[in-house]
Regions:
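Active-site core segments that coordinate phosphate-bearing ligands/cofactors
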Residues: 17-18, 116, 123-135, 145-165, ...
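Residue-level signal for inorganic ion chemistry
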Residues: 35, 58, 85, 112, ...
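Short glycine/proline- and acidic residue-enriched helix-loop micro-motifs
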Residues: 54-56, 128-138, 211-212
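Short beta-strand-loop/turn "lid" adjacent to the catalytic site in phosphate-handling enzymes
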Residues: 75-110, 136-142, 167, 171-191, ...
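Structured loop/turn residues at beta-strand edges in well-structured enzyme cores
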Residues: 80, 210, 396
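Glycine- and other small-residue-rich loops at beta-strand/loop junctions that grip anionic moieties
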Residues: 108, 140, 218, 243, ...
Length: 498
């Protein structure tokens, strides 16, 4: 007999809502317990501000877009009881909010690097170095902790202005008051996933630990949807709300790549690669960090600045689908390409001065399809280097890769990724972080992997083409050589089979 669900429904009849706060928009998906998507919605985010190292968005627009996306997802099921709702957000994005979870300033985005231009006093930097040693990884300028220090130095944190991570902020808007955070979102605010907030270290860098939120396990119930939020979103009032996660972890959940050796590669605006290990992976360079697995163990990975946003930057007015048709029959390009917009890379290597480049035969051409082709190859080589980096740190990086994110819809690009990686790449039927948040909303405590296996279906499997292996291995060597020439990675020996 099915277990009772919310409001007297049966578990098998309940629907689960996932909300994904992305860089360019908000997405929502309504999912059944068997993984069937019953409704989807999305809304763009248009009021962002980029100015050098500054990158801000309007948290009010996050809430407006959340309402629009959720109303669209629920359109065919008005008033249907929901099992629970869960929200994911971009890792490292921070906002100040009041006692009713309303914003009192702009959202400082995950890649806002103003801390580079406004270094902390020497005593604070020394305390940050001590904190980094305690955490076992550096505290880079884009971490939420650095943003928090910047806000504190400006006197903007106080009783009526407490920090919240992006996903927690929208979760709080749903509940009607601030909510606890989870270990994945708190990591870049300096939270120690093994021992909690390092209060003594935070005191020494000048932050009051009392201003920081409580931390609960990912997926823990944190409240119910308030009447005002119900009117705004269409979610029935009283629907359970659970602590969310980062967009990268949500995408990993959507892939069901939660067993050691399996990896989830989310290629969208940026590239995020995550896997599962029984022991925590430590990277002294800070390119790789590990989240707590809600089931136990660890979820190591990293997030690059490289990603598909380079297409719109380098090829304005051109649609990737049109360029794909023209690019699919082109030969492996000569030279090397790094697909980066802006300055600075954080994974699979840390190089604050890194910029995109395109070198060798065919570089600098004006044909959009050839330019798209070279950028696509660059993305695949970044992904291969990322897996190599994880393997050198001791992670089991030999297994299947599951591709999620918007780029997974491009079959040519996904096949290219399988060919460059020289391993099978799976594409789930539903590849977005919103789906992963819906899985998290449904998962009982300690059963996230089992819930994901039950809900996630494979739509395609791409096998690597052995006829292309030698040419692509040579291309990867050129790629590594170009990075080493710039001092971004150490010189490498001949790459073997991944």
């Amino acid at each position: 007999v099915p277990a009772p669900g919310p409001a007297g429904t049966c578990e098998s009849a309940a629907l689960w809502l996932g909300i994904d706060l992305g860089t360019q928009g908000v997405r929502a998906q309504l999912v059944g317990g068997d993984g069937t998507v019953h409704g989807s919605g999305g809304a763009p985010l248009l009021r962002g501000r980029r100015d050098g190292p500054r990158h801000e968005q309007d948290p009010g627009e996050w809430w407006e877009a959340t309402g629009a996306a959720v109303r669209s997802a629920l359109a065919d099921h008005p008033g249907h009881p929901l099992g629970a709702v869960c929200v994911d957000g971009t890792s490292g994005t921070l906002v100040l909010q009041d006692s009713r979870a309303r914003p009192v300033g702009p959202g400082l985005m995950y890649d806002d690097a103003r801390a580079t231009r406004a270094p902390a006093p020497a005593r604070t930097e020394a305390a940050l170095d001590d904190l980094a040693m305690h955490l076992g990884q550096p505290v880079p300028p884009t971490w939420a902790l650095r943003k928090l220090l910047l806000l504190a130095s400006e006197g903007r944190i106080g009783p009526g202005a407490r920090p919240a991570h992006q996903g927690d902020h929208i979760t709080g808007r749903l509940v009607g008051c601030p909510v606890p955070t989870d270990p994945t979102q708190a990591l870049k605010t300096g939270h120690d996933p093994e021992h909690g907030w390092p209060r003594a270290h935070l005191d020494r860098i000048g932050l009051d630990p009392a201003h920081l939120p409580e931390v609960v396990s990912t997926g823990t119930p944190v409240g119910t949807v308030a009447p005002g939020a119900a009117r705004h979103t269409g979610i029935p009032a009283g629907t359970p709300v659970r602590a969310g996660t980062t967009d990268g972890v949500a995408a990993q959940i959507a892939s069901a790549a939660l067993a050691p050796g399996r990896w989830a590669a989310t290629l969208g605006t940026t590239l995020v690669l995550k896997g599962s290990t029984p022991r925590r992976i430590h990277d002294p360079a800070g390119a790789v960090y590990s989240h707590r697995n809600p089931d136990g163990g660890w979820l190591p990975g990293g997030a690059a600045n490289a990603g598909t946003r380079v297409w719109s930057h380098a090829l304005p007015g051109h649609h990737p689908a049109d360029l794909t048709e023209r690019a699919r029959d082109l030969p492996v390009p000569g030279g090397a390409t790094y697909p980066l917009t802006g300055t600075g890379e954080r994974f699979p290597f840390v190089a604050p001065d890194a910029t995109g480049f395109d070198t060798g035969p065919g570089s600098g051409g004006t044909d959009p399809a050839q330019r798209f082709h070279r950028l696509a190859h660059g993305l695949a080589h970044v992904e291969r280097l990322a897996l190599d980096r994880l393997r050198t740190l001791g992670a089991p990086a030999h297994g299947l890769v599951t591709a999620t994110g918007g780029a997974a819809d491009n079959t040519w690009l996904t096949q290219l990724r399988a060919d460059v990686l020289r391993r099978p790449v799976l594409v789930p039927a539903h590849t977005g972080s919103a789906f992963g948040s819906a899985v998290l909303a449904r998962a009982p405590r300690g059963a996230l992997a089992a819930t994901a296996e039950a809900m996630v279906r494979t739509a395609r499997r791409h096998e690597p083409d052995p006829a292309r292996a030698d040419a692509l291995d040579e291309a990867h060597e050129r790629f590594l050589h170009a990075l080493a020439e710039r001092g971004w990675i150490a010189p490498t020996r001949q790459a073997g089979r991944p």
